[in-house]
Structures are given as structure tokens and as C-alpha cells.
Amino acid sequence: NTRPESVNAKILKQFIEIGLDRLSVGLEHGNFNFRKNVLKRNPSNETLLEHLEIIANSGVSFSINNIIGFPTETREMIFETIEFNRLIRGFDALTISIFTPYQGTELRELAIKENYYDSESLTTHTTSSSLLKMPHLTSEQIDGIFRTFLMYVRFEKELLPEIERAESFTSEGNRIWKQLFDLYQERYY
């Protein structure tokens, strides 16, 4: 596991020489201001893309790791992460996680301060559903984007309205999601 900005051609070449064949790269978020001010990661999107291009050109297989559902995050910010992923070339896998408010982290404290999370709750493992109660982005909305994130990144823009309908956990949303999931499996596995 690494951050994109920590990779340069010289270091990557040295790791390849000793047997590196795969990298897992933590992008986490595509909105520069959110990444800088909330996640405390300063590299610009342009810098990250430059470093990801070095990895893509090396021939090393790599995956991109993303997180959604952060405290104060909006739907628009999540879609900036999706759009940023659409710019990255050469990856062979994407992972998407939902933010987990781990004890002792600044982000957990932010969630508590904003009344998105109960200070008495303890989380000891990653979650498959958002634990935050944000008025501007519900757990169900986060879960819907979570289940369609890979489709938003990989599919052509003409399918975006259908993907948005697949976010919904209704019978229609589930039916559309299943059709799109089957198409995703056919194309990418």
C-alpha cells in the first residue's frame, strides 16, 4: 500500500528489480480542498495524476483505493472522486470503502462535533454501511453510491442516468443495478 505522491520512477524501478508486481494506491478522495483540509493530504490532483501515470507506465499492476461517506462530505464531492478516478489510466482494480469513525482519529472527532455520530459508539472494524447520520447525505444515499461507484467510474457517461437509478434500494433500483452489475462483470472480469 502506498500513496501516489510517494512514488517516483527511480523508487518504482528499484522495487520492480526486487520483485514488486503489484501496488495498492490510496487516493481516498478526489476533491483537492477536502483532501487537503480534512484529510491533511496536500498534493494537488495534477501531482497525483503525474505520479499515477508513472505507475501506469511502469507495467506494474495497481489498484486505486477510495473512501466515501466522510464527515461533511457531500454528494458533489463524492462525484468529484468518481470523476478523478475516470481520469486515471492503467489501473486494473478499484476499491471503494465507506468511512469508518475509528476511535482516536480526528475524523471521528469531527463526526461527533458535527453531531453525525454518537460519542458513545465504538467501531472496531470497517463497515459495509455508513454509520454517520448526516442531514445532507443519508446513510442510504451513501450506500447507494457505494454499490454503484465502480459503474460510475468505468461505464460511459450515457449510462449515468441509469446508474443513478440503480442507487435506489427499491425493486426498480435493484433490477437496474442487477442489469448493470451483470454488464460490469461481463466487461471487466
Segments the model singles out, each with a brief description of its role:
Residues 1-171:
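A structural motif corresponding to the C-terminal lobe/cap of the Radical SAM core domain
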Residues 170-189:
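C-terminal non-catalytic accessory extensions
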